[in-house]
Design a protein with these regions (language model features):
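Bacterial N-terminal signal peptides that target proteins for export
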Residues: 1-12
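Bacterial N-terminal signal peptides
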Residues: 10-21
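Folded, non-transmembrane soluble domains that reside on the lumenal/extracytoplasmic side of membranes
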Residues: 25-146
Length: 146
């Protein structure tokens, strides 16, 4: 192997190691949940009556053994990956029963107009990607219509 090829291979290897280390230490900045765990309107887009409704429904559903369904609105997630942000939020906040893994996070990001529904593995048979996709499409259509 020529010196040029060895140097090139060494450079590529060093860049690969650097990239892996940067990715491994990339931190997603997750806010703390509010005292009203089921509704976290950091974008200030939900009126107080609707917040109260979501909170009371979430509390009652959880008290009756149902999964925890949490709503989070953010103005921005500062360039973070939507999926990574939602997964890390669900983990940090401990959404759902740990053993049943039955939490649901509904995330709305205002600046990018993204909606994501993060579903714990314990609910994927009931709330699969297809159902979540239809819900998001219907919600998007309703929001667009005003």
């Amino acid at each position: 192997m020529s010196r040029g090829k060895i140097r090139f291979a060494a450079l590529i290897s060093a860049m690969f190691v650097l990239f892996i280390n940067i990715c491994a230490f990339a931190k997603v900045d997750i806010p703390n949940h509010t005292d009203r765990f089921f509704i976290n309107d950091y974008a200030n887009v939900i009126d107080s009556e609707t917040e109260d409704y979501i909170f009371e429904k979430g509390k009652a559903y959880n008290a009756n053994g149902g999964p925890q369904v949490v709503v989070l609105t953010m103005e921005s997630i500062d360039g973070n990956d939507l999926e990574d942000f939602s997964i890390e939020t669900a983990r940090k906040w401990g959404i759902g029963d740990k053993d049943a893994d039955n939490g649901v996070l509904i995330l709305l990001v205002m600046d990018s107009r993204d909606i994501r529904i993060e579903v714990g593995y314990g609910l994927e048979g009931v709330l699969n990607d297809g159902k979540c996709g239809r819900f998001i499409r219907n919600a998007t259509d309703s929001l667009s219509a005003g």
